[in-house]
From Swiss-Prot:
PROSITE patterns: RIBOSOMAL_S15. This is Small ribosomal subunit protein uS15. It comes from the Bacteria. NCBIfam families: S15_bact (TIGR00952). GO terms for molecular function: rRNA binding; structural constituent of ribosome. Gene3D superfamilies: 6.10.250.3130, S15/NS1, RNA-binding (1.10.287.10).
Length: 89
């Protein structure tokens, strides 16, 4: 269910704005998106796992807040990130 260390490092390397960048909104949103997609697949097979469903909703809310922050801070970075991740915004 959780991301492997290798997969998380791949995502960080792909979306980092500079070397060693793990805290930028782009990286955080990309990692959250991967976790959300993984959890969505889990919930498709385990429909009654309400505990994980609540965790999914919390992750979606955190991602929404980060995207709102990025949109207010820099619209071009926001649009580029949405396009790269394939989010419907």
């Amino acid at each position: 269910m959780a991301l492997s260390k290798e997969r998380k490092n791949e995502i960080i390397a792909e979306y980092a704005t500079k070397q060693g960048d793990t805290g930028s909104p782009e990286v955080q949103v990309a990692v959250l998106t991967e976790q959300i997609n993984t959890l969505n697949d889990h919930l498709r097979t385990h429909k009654k796992d309400h505990h994980s469903r609540r965790g999914l909703l919390k992750m979606v809310g955190r991602r929404r807040n980060l995207l709102t922050y990025l949109r207010n801070k820099d619209v071009t970075r926001y649009r580029e990130l949405i396009q790269r991740l394939g989010l419907r915004r």
